[in-house]
């Protein structure tokens, strides 16, 4: 259960967030994902209030993240020991819990030695404040370096990798997924429905459906959902995908989630919801599996799209906290 909508002006308020969480847990979902940077900590606070007041804390695996900016100061972001320790204490307070089950580094910090990050995480694990560590939006080579560092320094390691992965952003499957399977790292994809693009609700006109993420989130400066998904290749792939769903009477949500889940090592695809009905729709779709002959058609569409319009993975890798040299600069 993804929770970046909680406390967002375009998302949901606390009452709705609690109703969403209750519906999700009642339906068998037991993984809740958040971040200290989601809506200035409001997401963590809403989750913490619900789990503490309902007495359901031990029914879920609770995951959160550090690294993104949570204030204006130079130490209010990053993967340094200084920031991680402070971030964990603040997350524990907002989440109203004594432990974080899975703590991610939200993205690679190129200006902090990865050993410093892992030693801080190792200490927090020994203190019982976190149970497992994970990485999010890391390039494969950085995850590999982290695993090697943990091995040679005898430190707790990254046990999970979370990144965007869906039919329209398939890059994770090229290298990271097989690498993670080989090294026993769980793969936790987010945005398996491509922010709703795979439902087919957005047409080639380029006009977003009113009230959708594409409509509500500002993309005037680029880099947002429209910049990512509103192009001819994507619309063509979505048309083919939704046609398969219609032909076989299968929900698009089921096919999109099943495509992601078929990859070895994928453990908990994350979807978000702003309304209770969104959760109910996913639970209903996920209650059954599509036949393999249907999924073979879906795989064909995904393979064709990747061959025609490959996308970089992960987005902006290496550009946060330091920029990788360009090809001309590297010569």
Predicted features and spans:
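Generic structural signal for well-ordered alpha-helices
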Residues: 21, 44, 48, 88-92, ...
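N-terminal binding-site loop/beta-alpha segment at the start of enzyme catalytic domains
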Residues: 1-60
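Aromatic-lined glycan-binding groove of carbohydrate-active enzymes
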Residues: 172-215, 251
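Glycine-rich beta-alpha junction loops
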Residues: 66-68, 139, 165-169, 191-202, ...
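Terminal-tail/helix-coil boundary detector
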Residues: 206-243, 247, 262-266, 276, ...
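Short, well-ordered coil/turn segments that N-cap beta-strands
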Residues: 28-30, 56-60, 97-101, 127-132, ...
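Glycine/proline-rich, positively charged
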Residues: 4, 26, 71-175
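Conserved, mostly hydrophobic/aromatic
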Residues: 17, 32, 47, 62, ...
């Amino acid at each position: 259960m993804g929770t970046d909508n909680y406390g967002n002006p375009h998302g949901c308020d606390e009452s709705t967030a609690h109703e969403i969480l209750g519906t999700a847990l009642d339906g068998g979902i037991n993984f809740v994902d958040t971040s200290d940077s989601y809506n200035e900590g409001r997401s963590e606070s809403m989750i913490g209030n619900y789990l503490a007041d309902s007495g359901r804390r031990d029914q879920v695996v609770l995951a959160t993240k550090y690294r993104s900016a949570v204030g204006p100061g130079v130490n209010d972001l990053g993967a340094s020991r200084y920031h991680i320790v402070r971030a964990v204490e603040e997350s524990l307070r907002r989440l109203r819990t004594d432990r974080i089950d899975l703590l991610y580094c939200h993205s690679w910090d190129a200006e902090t030695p990865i050993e410093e990050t892992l030693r801080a995480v190792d200490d927090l694990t020994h203190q019982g404040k976190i149970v497992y560590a994970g990485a999010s939006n890391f390039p494969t080579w950085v995850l590999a370096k982290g695993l090697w560092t943990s091995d040679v320094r005898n430190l707790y390691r990254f046990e999970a990798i979370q990144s965007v992965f869906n039919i329209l952003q398939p890059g994770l499957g090229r290298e990271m997924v097989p690498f993670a399977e080989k090294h026993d790292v769980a793969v936790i994809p987010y945005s398996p429905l491509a922010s709703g693009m795979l439902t087919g609700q957005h047409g080639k006109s380029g006009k977003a459906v009113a009230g959708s993420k594409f409509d509500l989130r500002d993309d005037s400066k680029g880099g947002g959902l429209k910049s990512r998904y509103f192009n001819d290749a994507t619309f063509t792939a979505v048309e083919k995908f939704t046609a398969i769903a219609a032909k076989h009477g299968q929900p698009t949500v089921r096919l999109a989630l099943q495509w992601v889940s078929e990859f070895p090592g994928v453990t908990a695809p994350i979807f978000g919801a702003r309304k209770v009905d969104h959760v109910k729709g996913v639970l209903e779709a996920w209650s059954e599996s599509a036949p393999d002959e249907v999924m073979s058609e879906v795989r064909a569409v995904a393979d064709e799209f990747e061959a025609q319009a490959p996308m970089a993975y992960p987005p902006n890798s290496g550009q946060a906290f330091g920029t990788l040299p360009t090809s001309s600069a590297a010569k």
